[in-house]
Amino acid sequence: MLLSIYGWRRICKQDRSRRGRTATCEMKMDDGSISTGSYDLIPLLNDFIDEHPDFSYKGAKAIIALTGYEGILGYRTASSYSETPDYESEKEQAARVAQCLRDDGWELASHSWGHLWMGVSDDPEIHTRSVMNVSTQIRINGKMRWSP
């Protein structure tokens, strides 16, 4: 599954009422307010599995293939944001959420930094610096899979 979570929404921090699970998403509304709820695939699938536990074999969920050009899981972790005051905090929060997802049965993979053609990119290692630090697999165009 390729899940694109850009800056206008993000996966929330751990929700302790849900057994420490990353249970909700935040979405910035047109009026600037923040709405929190099950607005994306991750919390929707978690809600479904809570109601139908036999759906998930041994607690497994899905593989989330991340890109990195706008950041990870809606957090501004891309190097283009390195001069912003919240950059280090955003990276730490994204790493915590990524670990929470792993602990809850989700797998994380790299879908490259931004749908790069790895063999012809000017900077083919950019995905390693920006995405591979939270994943153990690479999925390219849904056809190739690599695990180190």
What is each stretch, according to the model?
Residues 2-148:
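Metal-dependent polysaccharide deacetylase catalytic core of the NodB/CE4 family, i.e.
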